[in-house]
């Protein structure tokens, strides 16, 4: 990179190109300190928050550098002044650098640790896999009893209909077993809306498949030449149909049941019969398949509607209640005498709260709006309640854990005072027993007058903490208790909304909410009064902000108050929710582009890929919100591209007209996000062709080709004259059909899962043979009894333990083996020992072939590896974190003057943070899948990825904290003067750009599987340099301020101000507001205090990000390796 050296001559040559970055450089301003001992000329007479920020941050950065023993690489006095470039601070590699064999050493060490902890892991596995399911079995049965009964009754009725010979013969003859197969695929343990949509989609898909097959049958026997080679026509028809169905199911998951029914009908009708002429066609099989499959769909729908129906309303309200409960648990942990010293327990409660709201509630709400529901609540009111809960949780998410505002002794004393006060008043006691309100909590004016005398041995830190405790501890304690009571009342009100006699409870709910609203606002007001009293007291000073623990207490107070204010909004939204309660049919309202790629939770589990699909969905959502952020103009300033171009051209001229235009320059954004747009060309057709080529070469098409090839290979014997007889006689076409039903493109699995699925299939085959082989060969009563015995354990395995595919395999195999000989017309031969055995082992072998191929197909030819996806996911996650950091730095920290974040900016920030949280959780689920993959070639250490994910989660929390604090202060107002701002521009650019650049490099290394470069910019050193010069400017300002005040001549001060203003105006730059001594008392001290507190919090968060990024870099080097010379 070309760089420019600072000109050291006294009269620089004006012809030397300095680059487009034409501001005064840092080094030239640094020389002014030696040329002018008074420092920089422009001064501010009011105290600046830069002193607190610089002192805290610089001390921490100095300690970090000292602990790491970094040695900075010499920059030889060069400085970068061009736009688009920055000066990176590099440090020499650690003397304990990784050797080329370090990966081998790490792997050997990991292997030794794994061997040493083998017994511990074995005991944990035994506990997880055996003892815990046994202990929790009664609870799981009670919780899922209704679902198990619905699954059981639907399947049992289907078997009973099939074994009754008149009904079974009318429904499907020897293919009647498609009735229970359809029940298994479309089981009734779903919401009514989902079941109805699934039924309609499957009916349309099966009808379309039968129509396609009828056309293929007609064409294949229309003439004698085609009838002689009917297999070729059916082969072509099946290939086209499978290509269409598999690709559509892979791209748009909403068509899962449509394509499944379509494919089943296509595979069945293309392999079940081979005719030599149109007179040999047996169209009866269309009836046999269509009616049995239709009755299975209708039976599942009937059981879903009649037996304990679920409309989706109760599940969503359960998510809301759970969210309120976890928030209450977190607040209770803050004032728990036993947990006050356990930061880990409080942190776990905080993480659970975030997960419940950002993941569980969000997932439940999406499922609710993505399906047909019969709801009692207005959708817009539910959405407002969810958004207000999210806003409340945002402040609690960054709440400092276990600050020194409380200790266990003080909490016990507060609880004793509370109980004593309640016991003294019988009236208040009755009210408290009737409704757990906080009206009995004693309050007093918590002013510093209650502050205890300070002993001579106390440190400054202890003095500050004691002063803050005396002022705020009881008010904060009362506010937390009140928030807990309010959350409990909200949970009670939501339960009353669901009760049948809701109209009678509505007045009571309004009374509870109104009382909670007034009490909470009163506690917030009392906390505000305590704060104002403290600000006006003698204990309030600038030195408080130089203590980190005091800043934590202020942030705790601020974030808690913000969350309490948001809780007031939650109360209002809950009250609005109860004003419009009546039964209504809510159609799906989810955006179509996203609805086509989503399925309800139970349907996703039925697919068999577990939570892996959640990762791809979350990744699409994150990409979508970043695309919206980068292509939406959120500035308060107007932006006109045409006028900007005209101004740029006119600026090249020197006439009077162009000068007038420059005087009326419009305000534009400092950074234009169009560079981040995915559309890199102005030609729309070129972009569309690129998208088409991506689709044709994507994973969906590769999977389609692979599955179609395997299906055609398994179907091939049915079209050959030498093999079609035995293939159709023993229903061997169940091999391709089983393979199609069990294969999934996002399921890698391992040999243990293959064996588990195979064992379940063998159990089903054996049980079906036993049902027919028992006394009175093929007795309908025995078959029904065996069906009832096998469906109970596998329904529990299906619904409780989420082993959906293995349970489906067992029940499908039992259904086919039990009903195939029972349904054949020649009962005298088929229902004998020889007939039952031959039918069992031949058809069972076909089923086993389909089962064995269903999982290893993902291991060969364009395989799906969760480990590869995990590496790609880390690349995307690091890129998204880097872009989030850049967005916070651009739109919050270094925003233009008078360009505060808008409501749209805040909305995008909330959506981005929630979706990144969901993406992190989805990556953790992907890591669980990667742990169970078979190790073939590469070594994989999941603990390294787990450490990297934890570091990324910490980075996200700090980015959120910085975003919240960045909205409350302007960085330009904290500078001493405009020349300080110009001098620090390059250092601020270097500090932020170093972090973004490291994110970019790490992301690309994960995507390309390259090793991490040995030399990367050190953000900590860049940030240390920034605060070093901020401290220097602060010292220069203090020195100049003391020299100016020592003169005692007001005329000299006014003259200095005039000189400064004249200098600023002559330089052609806009002057920053310079507060005078006369009007400095008019500045709102409270606003300035919180501005400074948030500035310190922001600086600390960015310092934490720089430090955590070094840990991320170390984890990345452990995973990918490090380049060596």
Curated annotation (Swiss-Prot):
Residues 1-21, 426-449 are annotated as: Disordered. Residues 165-176, 220-227, 276-284, 728-750, 802-843 are extracellular. May be involved in intracellular vesicle transport. PANTHER family: 60S RIBOSOMAL PROTEIN L19, PROTEIN BRE4. InterPro entries: BRE4-related_DUF2421, Brefeldin_A-sensitivity_4, IVT-Associated. This is Protein BRE4. Glycans are attached at residue 830. It is a multi-pass membrane protein. Signal peptide: none annotated. Deletion of the gene leads to brefeldin A-sensitivity. Keywords: Glycoprotein, Membrane, Protein transport, Transmembrane, Transmembrane helix, Transport. Pfam families: BRE4. Belongs to the BRE4 family. Residues 1-10 have a biased composition (Basic and acidic residues). The lineage of its organism: Eukaryota, Fungi, Dikarya, Ascomycota, Saccharomycotina.
